[in-house]
């Protein structure tokens, strides 16, 4: 008997409005009482210390808030004279960043909840010696991509978000995409236009497909969502916002771009809505027309864009309060069809005007990807100064020229870990050099950020990018990497130094013309074939543009260093990842040879090669099973346990 067979029908979906919730009251208290807000910020940073390095160290730091430095975020570190360390900053993010700077450079500690930490503290806190003051030129330090919410974060709960928010604050992040609980905003909107809760649940996609649902590429995939989802995810979203508020991180929440279910016009006959095309074989949502012609008005049509937009923003405030002035929406992400009679310039103007009607301080956050944001679209903006374009892949394929030409603020981003594919990849040299060069030559670059499709490998590039927050000049990435390895592993020696030099010259080396969608993937995961396999997934590839034999030398050095550094979770993670890459590379060499032997009838060679390939698969499985970070079971367990009270069908 199924658990669901024995359960009563789910109760109607009911979510307490924000102002009536404990989160709403707390938010208002912080916003209206500066002294209380300051006390809470310092208290939360002290709590962060306890979570990261242990309670015994909390009172060893003296945190104080100070003003900005010439309008810029800043932190300073100094000795107190009584064995403690003073950290001063203009907000929680600056305080956490100052703490992180001290831990990395004086204690040789590296905190990374995603990729393993090295938290071995000295017996007592080393003295700073002189006051250190660091400021940033970048108004925005942005994090996340819609894809990250599906490829890595689909089933996260508070136990995942809390350490991630700590890490983000310690790395200077002050603007972060946040879609947790946004389904309730859509439910409260659509139920005002003829939709039942069940119909809304059918329209929404499941969390594994949220990326493409919220980017307006598809709908009704991977659902329906259980009724309990809405209240629980709103509660999580409010909890996330509470911590963000204390740190000084601004969430980027959803804006309204006119997207509605395909049957919207049937339910609302005086509206004008049309298909926006397909994406990779999936139907996109329909789009409400942003303006009415005289012919539309003569036919009795009404301006539903204004109506639904008002409802949407009212629902957004009802669910999450006035939590942010930053709104993300991309009406035509990765293509899409502009319906007949719709004007692209008017769409962009009207979408922004509706935001500004609701929130005069609104900033429209858009994604520049595949040249989807062009000068024509930007020319339609009602206020270019209240837009912010994320140039998603500035590290390898910058597309910032439309923003520069139109005078629209933009953010330099690193797009990484395409598709969540497991492969060592990244361009430290580019990150260390090009960010400051771009800023110095730009009139409108306002920040830096990470826009990874997933966050599942190559921690070096994330740490380096956010370290650039506090630098005004390019850095020597090779020296930086050696310091990074020392704190990540709790020490260093010639073996580690040589291993990382090789990694920088192989997997982490920038090559002109490099395949721009990230790391090669392991063809162990591909469907078997007697032809040469080029990828394991639709958008993947298996190109290796470095010397595999050189890379294997780095792996041998990691093996040599294992006993010295195995107590570091950071080292163990990197060890498994490097060895995994060696096995994936080796399998790739055998596969085409085995296919050729099979097709030519050389069964002896085929059996020899296929036996080696099977041995590699077994070795890969044994290696990856040694680390929780590489287990598919962890992903499955997260999916099954993310929702309280889920029946067995939902959990599976």
What are these regions (language model features)?
Residues 537, 555-558, 595-596:
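Large, well-folded core regions of big proteins
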Residues 319-324, 562-567, 582-587:
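A glycine-rich, aromatic-flanked flexible loop/lid motif
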Residues 543-551, 558, 562-565, 579, ...:
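Polar/charged low-complexity regulatory segments
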Residues 458-459, 561-566, 624:
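Membrane-interface helix-loop junctions at the exits of transmembrane helices
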Residues 50, 57-58, 107-127, 133, ...:
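Catalytic-core regions of glycoside hydrolase
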Residues 79-83, 438, 553-570:
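Short amphipathic alpha-helical segments and their helix-coil junctions
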Residues 1-186, 310, 354, 568, ...:
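Mature N-terminal, pre-catalytic/accessory segment of carbohydrate-active enzymes
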